[in-house]
Amino acid sequence: MTTFTAKNETVQRDWYLVDAEGKTLGRLATELARRLLGKTKPVYTPHVDTGDYLVVINAEKVVVTGKKLTDKYYHRFTGYVGNLKSESLGQALQRHPERVLEIAVKGMLPKGPLGRAMYRKLKVYTGSKHPHTAQQPQVLDI
């Protein structure tokens, strides 16, 4: 008996719609990362992209616990001296709420070409409208 290994051409990837309204940021991000990795499928293979496509709506209505809105900071460096930019989670949620969820999920995926391919299957939108109705995503309750 041989071990089953999924092939990239034969993996069936489904589209799922996730509503982030009222969901905790970290708990939602871990479940999204698991589905992007393909760990919920019986054909999971670590070195093959077996995950599904995920469309997340209402990203601005995600919830965080504790004092993270004021105490958690996102830093980015432009490469120039003295240009370390910082903003709190609360400020980031006001400016670009979809990016907060994207950063949380991206940190839970592998670093490398396979992780980048998995990350490209995540589509996050503010509001309840999205341009993926042609794919007929199934509603996923997390």
Curated annotation (Swiss-Prot):
Keywords linked to the UniProt accession: Ribonucleoprotein, Ribosomal protein
One Gene Ontology term from the biological process aspect of the record: negative regulation of translation
A cellular component annotation (GO) from this entry: cytosolic large ribosomal subunit
Signal peptide extent: none
Residue runs in coiled coils: none
SUPFAM superfamilies recorded: Ribosomal protein L13 (SSF52161)
Pfam family name, one: Ribosomal_L13
Molecular function per GO: mRNA binding; structural constituent of ribosome
Family per similarity comment: Belongs to the universal ribosomal protein uL13 family.
Function: This protein is one of the early assembly proteins of the 50S ribosomal subunit, although it is not seen to bind rRNA by itself. It is important during the early stages of 50S assembly.
Subunit field text: Part of the 50S ribosomal subunit.
Protein name: Large ribosomal subunit protein uL13
Organism: Xylella fastidiosa (strain Temecula1 / ATCC 700964)
